[in-house]
Swiss-Prot record:
GO terms for biological process: 'de novo' AMP biosynthetic process; IMP metabolic process. PANTHER family: ADENYLOSUCCINATE SYNTHETASE. Its cofactor is Mg(2+). GTP binds at residues 12-18, 40-42, 303, 329-331, 411-413. Keywords: Cytoplasm, GTP-binding, Ligase, Magnesium, Metal-binding, Nucleotide-binding, Purine biosynthesis. This is Adenylosuccinate synthetase. SMART domains: Adenylsucc_synt. GO terms for molecular function: adenylosuccinate synthase activity; GTP binding; magnesium ion binding. The gene is purA.
Length: 435
């Protein structure tokens, strides 16, 4: 199978960027298909730390093509800033190896202002957004008033689109006694960045379909995680896009089938507010936070930490049709005497083997745990499966049993090469990397 989808099976921060980087050595193209610069992927190469927000992880490998699909909310200033920051580090990024869908909706200053304004109005009921303007941009896309990348080359079309956009936003701003935005301001903002961003504009859907015909290997890189999905996540504490594998088709324009790989941490984290059944507000949570260095890549906010939730991950596997799991950050658990896995929930005398949709129930769920002895050995940087501690293998096998699909790779360390192969993949071996 030449097309692979990488999705997060928790609330994001599972280590997807590192896994995409690992698998991309023998791929041709990596595609972002949803989200925006509210997602952060951290990759360590030769002790150099790279933090990517919008750019696909393939930009760190020469000879690869990186693509941003139409499902991405595109902040043009953030993209150009990220490109320039990587160029300073010696990366060659140009319109031949980075292509952006002409249909991408653009995040503008009006979106960031609206998001912050409404978060402030929500007071104690904030969602905990990154204030990057992602949600308001998607609102405008669905409302058919967004400015898209393709609009920037046609002055008449851009003027019409701006009229529609500002009619909506200024009506809201007036109602809240907020400063009205003049069209000339928006035009200046767009003109400042248009010349830099337009060269990357491409008919991505056509290019991807041509790549498939040519037999090229494509990796689709998801952002956030399953339970931040607007439809299937812990609503309303979710992102504004679909994060599961089916979004690949609408977010890239490619209708081809793909092999879906899910990435999950060996424990659980989430940033911001919202239900979290296995959260540990105690020494366990503090240890996971400290050892795992759990700070948001984009927001720099402290991630909440808890035990691995097999119920949550199994549900995510079913939602995205996942065929294979990669379990990351096992080394974070090296020092624990006891390790727990959530195998079910209890609420009001009833046992749940799934995460109910109701927020009120989600917030009151009591996790049911299985407890395992820790391995108490340093595993960071280990490369060979046969050298792993017995108790670690037992833990991995139990996770595998509970989620119902095989774990092919595990990760024990932050570096690109800190990946251990447990099983062969069912798709073409040429996609894999051997260290």
């Amino acid at each position: 199978m030449n097309n692979i989808v990488i999705v997060g099976l928790q609330w994001g921060d599972e280590g997807k960027g590192k896994i995409v980087d690992y698998l991309s050595e023998n791929a041709d193209t990596v595609v972002r298909f949803q989200g925006g610069n509210n997602a952060g992927h951290t990759i360590v190469v030769d002790d150099e730390v790279y933090k990517l927000n919008l750019l696909p992880s393939a930009v760190l490998r020469t000879g690869k093509i990186s693509i941003i699909g139409n499902g991405v909310a595109l902040d043009p200033y953030a993209l150009i800033s990220e490109i320039e920051s990587l160029r300073v580090k010696g990366m060659d990024i140009n319109p031949n190896n980075l292509m952006v869908s002409e249909s991408c909706p653009l995040i503008l200053s009006v979106h960031k202002e609206k998001e912050k304004l409404f978060e402030d109005l929500n007071g104690n009921h904030k969602i905990g957004t990154t204030n990057k303007g992602i949600g308001p941009c998607y609102e405008d896309k669905v409302g058919r008033r967004a400015i898209r990348l393709c609009d920037l080359e046609n002055a008449d079309e851009l003027n019409k689109r701006l009229d529609t956009l500002l009619n909506y936003h200024n009506a809201i701003r007036k109602g809240l006694s907020y400063r009205v935005i003049k069209k000339e301001e928006m035009l200046r903002e767009i003109e400042e960045i248009a010349e830099k961003i337009i060269p990357y504009r491409k008919p991505v859907w056509k290019i991807l379909n041509d790549f498939v015909k040519e037999g090229k290997k494509i990796i689709f890189e998801g952002a956030q995680g399953t339970f931040l999905d607007i439809d299937h996540g812990t609503y309303p504490f979710v992102t504004s896009s679909n994060t599961i594998a089916s979004q690949v088709m609408t977010g890239s324009g490619l209708s081809s089938n793909a092999y879906v790989i899910g990435v999950a941490k060996a424990y659980t984290t989430r940033v911001g507010n919202g239900p979290f059944p296995t959260e540990q507000r105690n020494e366990v949570g503090n240890s996971l936070f400290t050892i795992g260095k759990e700070l948001g890549t984009v927001s720099n906010r402290k991630r909440r930490c808890g035990w691995f939730d097999a119920v949550l991950v199994r549900q995510a596997v079913q939602l995205s049709g996942v065929s294979s799991i990669i379990l990351t950050k096992l080394d974070v658990l090296d020092s624990f005497d006891k390790i727990k896995i959530c195998t079910g929930y209890q609420y009001s005398g009833k046992i749940y083997d799934y995460l109910p949709a109701s927020r009120s129930i989600q917030e009151e769920l009591e996790p049911i745990y299985e407890e395992f002895p820790g391995w108490k050995e340093n595993t960071q940087g280990e490369k060979l499966a046969e050298k792993l501690p017995v108790n670690l293998i037992k833990y991995v096998k139990r996770v595998e049993e509970l989620i119902g699909i095989p774990i092919h790779l595990i990760s024990a360390g932050p570096k690109r090469e800190d990946v251990i192969k447990l099983k062969d993949f069912k798709f073409s071996e040429s996609v894999l990397v051997s260290y």
